[in-house]
Design a protein with these regions (language model features):
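Transmembrane alpha-helical segments of polytopic membrane transport and secretion proteins
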Residues: 1-17, 64, 229-240
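Membrane-interfacial helix termini and adjacent extracytoplasmic/periplasmic loops
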Residues: 3-21, 28, 85-117, 185-189
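Interhelical loop and adjacent transmembrane-helix boundary motif
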Residues: 25-28, 183-224, 228, 232
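Transmembrane alpha-helix signature in integral membrane proteins
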Residues: 28-59, 168
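Faces of alpha-helical transmembrane segments in polytopic inner-membrane proteins
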Residues: 51, 74-82, 104-128, 158-166, ...
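Cytoplasmic-entry segments and transmembrane alpha-helices of multi-pass inner-membrane transporters
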Residues: 55-89, 139
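Amphipathic cytosolic juxtamembrane alpha-helices at the membrane-cytosol interface
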Residues: 65-70, 143-166
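C-terminal transmembrane helix and the adjacent membrane-cytosol boundary/short C-terminal tail
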Residues: 121-139, 143-146, 150, 154-155, ...
């Protein structure tokens, strides 16, 4: 191994050790970034479940003109580019824009709104799919017993509670690692709108690889936990 390679690997190893130390010793800046990421992404994903589950269930059990068009729109939203969401919200939140009076630009609530928009189609789609996969006789039986539409929605929700958990975890996983919308509407302000993904981009650009790697380690752990929970939900649901 030549001197250049040795120096490279030595610096990389030193940076990794420093990254672990930042996490273990409770570095205030690093843990503030972690906390902000979790607060913003959890709030946005939980909020998306409130309208997303009823809408998804309603679309699945209803028949009306334009239903397929609505489903296609939700499917399009499933792959909505975060940078496009960030661009649209940034324009709306400009000082003289339609929502400029709210003074939300470069604030955590603006990031929550952006992530909510990204989460909502995911929750709607996965809820609709879960309801459609139920035995049709179950819905007919509920209606025959006199269940109202609201009671029907509640009973269907109980039947698909594991897929609903999977829908939430998928939504959370989708936004916790996105960077485009968060950067554009949040501005990456320290102690306020700086989250794991935006911090990684900034710290890498500045050559602060220790903090960038610390944030990267936490982000990988979060994604790993989400993937593990999704796998558990899928396998448990498969053997019900």
């Amino acid at each position: 191994m030549d001197a250049v390679s040795w120096e490279y690997w030595s610096e990389l190893g030193s940076g990794f050790v420093d990254a672990i130390l930042l996490l273990v010793t409770g570095d205030p800046e690093t843990w503030t970034i972690i906390r902000q990421s979790l607060v913003i992404s959890i709030t946005a994903s939980v909020a998306s479940v409130i309208p997303g589950v009823p809408i998804g269930a309603w679309v699945a059990v209803s028949s009306f003109p334009g239903r397929n068009l609505l489903i296609a729109a939700f499917n399009t939203g499933f792959g909505l580019p975060p940078v496009v969401v960030g661009l649209i919200l940034s324009i709306l939140l400009l000082r003289h824009g339609p929502l400029g009076g709210l003074n939300l630009r470069f604030t955590p609530p603006a990031m929550m709104v952006a992530q909510f928009i990204l989460c909502l189609p995911i929750v709607i789609n996965l809820t609709a799919v879960a309801v459609q996969q139920l035995n049709p006789k179950l819905r007919l039986q509920m209606r025959a017993l006199g269940a109202s539409r609201s009671q029907l929605m509640w009973l269907l929700g109980r039947e698909i509670r594991l897929p609903l958990l999977g829908a939430y975890m998928a939504a959370f996983g989708a936004v916790v690692h996105e960077v485009g919308a968060s950067q554009m509407v949040g501005g990456n302000l320290p102690g306020s709108t700086r989250v794991l993904t935006t911090a990684i981009v900034m710290e890498t650009g500045m050559g602060h690889y220790d903090r960038a790697m610390a944030c990267g380690i936490v982000l990988l752990l979060l994604v790993g936990v989400v993937a593990g929970l999704l796998t558990w939900v899928q396998q448990r649901d498969a053997y019900r």
